[in-house]
Amino acid sequence: MATLRKNPFTPTFGHASFAFAGRDEFIDDVIEELANQPGDPNRSTIFLGPRGAGKTVLMNAIAREASSMGWTNANAVARHGLLEDLMFALKTNSAHILGEQSPPQLTSIKVGPVGASRESPQESVPWRFRFQQIIEELNCQGVGVLFTIDEVNPECKELIDFISLFQLFVSEGRDVAMLLAGLPNMVSTLLESNYVSFVRRAFQLHLSTIPDEDIKDTFLSTITENERTIIAQSGL
């Protein structure tokens, strides 16, 4: 029985695409910026564009490329619980480097009715120092940390908090980078906040309409790479 090949033109939903029409230059630009020295403002990048412009897919592609260059990624969506999500992702994605984390500790016990409670040994430690500890351990092993945050929401207090933390990490010379992605109006409102003036210096990439010629070239290369032919190129 013949095996059906996966259609390379099937739309994706935030995961890896077969090709990036007109977006390769963006990926190259950001990857080049990661090679800059810690503290370079271009290590912070904001992707702006309407829904469906490919912000999430592009950000994920950059994170994968960065991973192959010795970075570890912590990704999350700007919502309640952002800091916890970033911490969990950072620990999970760097577990093969840092090894096993300390187990929860017994912190209290009751006799009547019998009971006990456990908490993480770092639960009472401020977020700044919890992140710093892991970042420092990774940096000491030559591993940079790339934070990627999608769906920028100026109403998300934890996003404001994290940007402030990231500014501290940068000022301390830590090997970190940050990618943000969001709708233009959401990003604009965020940048107007007095609490995130630091990120106004970030490199902004506006994802607009892809040129027709880039779309045509991508169609042709995708068809060729999948061992297919097109009879009338004028139809593209």
Q: Where do the protein language model's features map onto the residues?
A:
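A short, basic N-terminal segment
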Residues: 1-43, 92, 107
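Conserved NTP-binding/hydrolysis module of P-loop NTPases
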Residues: 67-72, 83-116
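Conserved nucleotide-binding/hydrolysis micro-motifs of P-loop NTPases
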Residues: 52, 79-83, 154, 183-188, ...
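Conserved small helical "lid"/interfacial subdomain of P-loop NTPases
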Residues: 207-234
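Walker A/P-loop nucleotide-binding motif
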Residues: 39-61
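Conserved catalytic segments around the Walker B and adjacent sensor/switch elements
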Residues: 46, 63-82
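A short helix-turn-beta junction within AAA+ P-loop NTPase domains corresponding to the substrate/partner-engaging
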Residues: 192-209
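Conserved Walker B catalytic segment
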Residues: 120-185, 192-195
